A protein has these predicted regions:
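Amphipathic, well-ordered alpha-helical segments in soluble domains
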Residues: 28-29, 56-63, 90-94, 118-121
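Acidic, low-complexity proline/glycine-rich segments
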Residues: 2-33
Length: 124
């Protein structure tokens, strides 16, 4: 049986998380996150989130692809390429499939305007 360990087995992570308790609570207990979790987020907001998350995931996949190029060992290349594979062939594909059911094709996803918040996050 799986049990929840807020430290993920790391004393350092546990100390960092304890030190950031209030910001962590604001982050993980945000109304948007809560509404996704309990299914009360407005449908339109969820679709908007999926489009923006697609944009984010594309940037994230590119960053990991760059890690493949910059890797110094085969093991590093394998790790980074497996993450690129998971993102591009599974997680992003899920977004494409769900958005297609909403009438949003992948070309539209790929050319979607990036929200300011997303832009700020992906370019920091």
């Amino acid at each position: 049986m799986l049990t929840y360990d807020p430290t993920y087995g790391s004393a350092v992570y546990g100390a960092w998380r304890a030190a950031a308790r209030e910001p962590w609570q604001r982050y993980t207990r945000h109304a948007f996150v809560e509404r996704i979790a309990d299914g009360t987020l407005a449908h339109r907001s969820f679709v908007y989130y999926l489009v923006q998350d697609y944009v984010f995931l594309m940037h994230y996949a590119r960053a990991w692809a760059l890690a493949v190029v910059k890797a110094e060992t085969r093991e590093e290349m394998q790790l980074a390429s497996s993450i690129v594979n998971g993102l591009t062939n599974h997680e992003i594909q899920l977004h494409v499939s769900v958005c297609a059911k909403e009438g949003i094709c992948e070309d539209e996803l790929f050319s979607a305007d990036e929200a300011f918040e997303n832009l700020a996050y992906t370019r920091y």
